[in-house]
Amino acid sequence: MLKGALTALITPFNENGSVDEETFCNFIEWQITQGIDGLIPAGTTGESPTLSHEEHKKVIELCVEKVAKRVPVVAGAGSNSTDEAVELAQHAKKAGADAVLVVTPYYNKPNQEGIYSHFATIAKAVSIPIVIYNIPGRSVVDMAVETMKDLCQNFKNIIGVKDSTGNIERVSEQREKCGKDFVQLSGDDQTALGFNAHGGVGCVSVASNVAPKLCAELYAACRSGDYKTALELNDRLMPLNRSIFIEPSPSGIKYAVAKLGFCRDTVRLPLVPLKDTTKEIIDAALQHAGLIKE
């Protein structure tokens, strides 16, 4: 069900900081016409930490309605409160999402038993497919491969992982422990090519907010074994992949999307707008990728 390039969607804001629903829906339509393979609303790139619960749920509802089953929608449903994560997953199911993306609990730093129990509780509470989101760089906890194996073996609705460890070896380890049908999606644009060569089936991409066509073509080439084409596409995208993370994300990718004319580059505090020097680097990366003219 899940493969290829799945965009970790930005959430556009109006000048007053409210969610720009019209722009969001228009942006989703453009993503689909560009050939994107799936969409992920209300995740980290969508500034979920600073969305209210009502806004979070509305963003998912808008996305599901606009997509209308044309591509899979994987709704962000993570929280460091297990009860809250259950509530968000239940809402995503009710809204019509195809799956949920659930991050490892951040800040409270549970051990492996706590991580297992968190996901087990969610899996028991909902029938919707669950994708684990393992991002130790932000959550400060790392789900062990053995924990992941136990979860996928014990709960059939835990179907895969968005792996943002940046550790290519993990792909082979998780493939060995969790099986070949366990969906492994890279969560790191910069290492995604190697990730897919090791057995991944795509990427939850930040860069695809501005380059959905290029990203979809890259992972289609990976799936067909055409790594010559994949490498050429990756070379075009790599400066962009790097530059959008010079400052805390999603400030960089929001600026890039705004540069293409889709939305404002407004982010919510504590995130702040980019420095001019960073904007210049992103501009050059967009030119290198052929997304804007010099």
UniProtKB/Swiss-Prot annotation:
PROSITE patterns with a match to the protein in the record: DHDPS_1, DHDPS_2
Enzyme class per UniProt: lyase
Protein name: 4-hydroxy-tetrahydrodipicolinate synthase
Site, Part of a proton relay during catalysis: residue positions: 44, 107
One term of GO molecular function: 4-hydroxy-tetrahydrodipicolinate synthase activity
Source organism (scientific name): Bartonella bacilliformis (strain ATCC 35685 / KC583 / Herrer 020/F12,63)
Pathway: Amino-acid biosynthesis; L-lysine biosynthesis via DAP pathway; (S)-tetrahydrodipicolinate from L-aspartate: step 3/4
CDD domains: DHDPS
